[in-house]
């Protein structure tokens, strides 16, 4: 029997202490002046020496996002290598929690070893939340609303194959393949007040 598990989590823009919970379980924060995600001194050297993902992989990330955005009146995102470097740095730590605001996470587990990366699994899971979006409360689909958020203009993503026993799993769990998908966005979406910013940024 084939068994796989996908976990998804999103974080609000400018959250003071991000946590690996669904964005809609938390109150949005106020929109403020933001700049692209900073690279801290701890990881600056590592990021400077990190190779960019191959263009074929970048194209997959952008296609998965922009096909969905095109259906909801949002312009196509462009690739942001700074955000991608930061995503790769975080993904490689295999920690199931957020590193910053304006970020979507997904994890895919399989009991079969050496399963290949599949970007559409991560982004596809976020996009699949669309039917859960509540246009009255502007809640229920935090990952999807970040994907289609109109004010967001660029994205940088990374995928990393984590060892068993990471990403919140136990070493005794059956998962032999653990893929971690991380995307960072600028400008971050999911900001408040909801009734002001969601109607102009999320087109169902």
UniProtKB/Swiss-Prot annotation:
Superkingdom classification of source: Eukaryota
Pfam families: CAP
Keyword line: Fruiting body, Glycoprotein, Secreted, Signal
Signal sequence range: 1-16
GO cellular component: extracellular region
Classification via PROSITE patterns: CRISP_1, CRISP_2
InterPro entries membership: Allrgn_V5/Tpx1_CS (IPR018244), CAP_dom (IPR014044), CAP_sf (IPR035940), CRISP-related (IPR001283)
Annotated localization: Secreted
SUPFAM superfamilies hit by this protein: PR-1-like (SSF55797)
Record-annotated SCP domain positions: 62-185
Glycosylation sites: 80, 118, 134
Family: Belongs to the CRISP family.
Protein name: Fruiting body protein SC7
Organism: Schizophyllum commune
Gene: SC7
């Amino acid at each position: 029997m084939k068994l796989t598990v996908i976990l998804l989590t999103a974080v609000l823009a400018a959250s003071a202490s991000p946590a690996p919970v669904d964005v809609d379980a938390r109150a949005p924060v106020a929109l403020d002046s933001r700049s692209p995600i900073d690279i801290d001194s701890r990881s600056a050297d590592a990021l400077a020496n990190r190779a960019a993902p191959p263009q074929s992989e970048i194209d997959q990330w952008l296609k998965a996002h922009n096909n969905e955005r095109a259906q909801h009146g949002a312009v196509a995102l462009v690739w942001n290598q700074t955000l991608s470097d930061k995503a790769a740095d975080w993904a490689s730590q295999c920690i199931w929690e957020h590193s910053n605001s304006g970020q979507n996470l997904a994890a895919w587990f399989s009991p079969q070893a050496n399963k290949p990366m599949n970007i559409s699994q991560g982004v596809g899971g976020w996009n699949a939340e669309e039917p859960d979006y509540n246009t009255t409360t502007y809640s229920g689909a935090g990952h999807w609303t970040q994907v289609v958020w109109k004010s967001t203009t660029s994205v940088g993503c990374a995928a990393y194959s984590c060892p068993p026993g990471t990403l919140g799993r136990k070493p005794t769990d059956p998962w032999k393949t653990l893929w971690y998908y991380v995307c960072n966005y600028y400008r971050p979406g999911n900001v408040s007040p909801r009734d002001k910013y969601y109607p102009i940024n999320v087109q169902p």
